[in-house]
Amino acid sequence: DGCDVGVSVTKAETIWAKYPEGQRRPHRFRDGMWSNCNLFALKSRETLGAAKAFEGGGQFGKSKKRVLQAFGWFNLLLYVSKMMTLKGTFERISKRFGVRIAPIEMPFAEAPIDVDNERTARIAREILAARAAEAA
């Protein structure tokens, strides 16, 4: 849609329908719950500044200071209060970073499953085993 940065997201319902334990903390918006897939598309070098704010991967969200620096108090308040839609949130973030950032919906339940603990490692092993069985 003419964006400069694409951020892949999957609906929480999509994940939970296939993997009930697959994602425990989706982002909650006024129009639904979404999980980040940690897959980004950057149109040009000029968009790298927006991506720099998220260096460090999944640990970004665990640092309140980094989240506040990246998004600002008001955007954080809107997010926490669930007053914004997914699209509206990305529009506000776009203004904050000075580039057009848009969500890209991924239809794959597996896309946002990070392997960063025993529970998600088990889910990943189950996914791989099921795919191997299908291929055999």
Question: For each predicted feature, which ranges?
Answer:
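Conserved active-site beta-strand element of glycosyltransferases/polysaccharide synthases
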Residues: A102-E105, D114
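Short, charged/polar low-complexity linear motifs in solvent-exposed/disordered segments
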Residues: V67-L68, T120, R131
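Conserved core of the sugar-phosphate nucleotidyltransferase
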Residues: D1-R92, M106-A109
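Short, conserved phosphate/pyrophosphate- and ester-handling motifs at nucleotide-, phospho-/glycolipid
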Residues: N117
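Short basic/hydrophobic patches in alpha-helices and adjacent helix-turn junctions
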Residues: R92-A102
